[in-house]
Swiss-Prot record:
PROSITE patterns reported for this sequence: RIBOSOMAL_L36
SUPFAM superfamilies, per database record: Ribosomal protein L36
Similarity remark: Belongs to the bacterial ribosomal protein bL36 family.
Annotated protein name in UniProt: Large ribosomal subunit protein bL36
Keywords: Ribonucleoprotein, Ribosomal protein
KW Ribosomal protein (keyword) present: yes
Length: 41
């Protein structure tokens, strides 16, 4: 999982990327290509 300051550019890298809030953290998840997982930090 990558840790980035800004997830906006990561979200646009693949069409299946979703921005999700879990436990106060912001994540990008992708069900089809797991390598696009990222967390804002």
């Amino acid at each position: 999982m990558k840790i980035r300051n800004s997830l906006k550019s990561l979200k646009d890298r693949h069409r299946d990327n979703r921005v999700i809030r879990r436990r106060g953290r912001v994540y990008v998840i992708n069900k089809t290509q797991k390598r696009f997982k990222a967390r804002q930090g």
